[in-house]
Amino acid sequence: YNKLKTRTFINNMSRIGNTATDRFTFKPRMNTEIRGTTHLKCFQEHKEKLFKCMVSLKYKKITNAAVLASIRMRIGSVNQFRPAYAKFIYKKYNSKKVLDISAGWGGRMLGAMACGIDYTGFDTNLNLVEPYKQILAAYPHEGTCKLVSVDSSTVDYSTYDYDTVFTSPPYFMLEKYEHMPTY
């Protein structure tokens, strides 16, 4: 987070900040279902195939990164929005008050925190309420961050003050979020 906050120029494809959100939202992401399974179930049910994949990918050691790479090759990945890209967008458009109708894994919020700007995010995934609180508590920031656990399609946006709307809609057709309705 400190690198994300202090660097004045960050390549918009940078992964800086990803581990800051992973620290709190990695587990719910790994419990998100894609292609009929989760990363955890894939590991439990296909260890032998995953190890063969690691060998074919020429990993010399079995590490968390090697296991994740093998799982992603098998079923795909549940990606987070890069906080560095969010920061890039906020800086480019001189954002001061961001509205995010689908807060997701916290990447856009972390980008706003690193910029010291206000952020209001909506998300119905109740499994993320505690991780959001943990992110806010873990990283010092100047702007106000507000997270609201409601369906953003029911919100009266005229009651909010914002100069930027920036979001990444959920991938309901590809991902099934834990304890969430299927659309």
Label every model-predicted segment.
Residues 1-33:
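Long, acidic/serine-threonine-rich intrinsically disordered regions with weak helical/coil propensity
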Residues 1-4, 29-183:
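Class I S-adenosyl-L-methionine-dependent methyltransferase catalytic core
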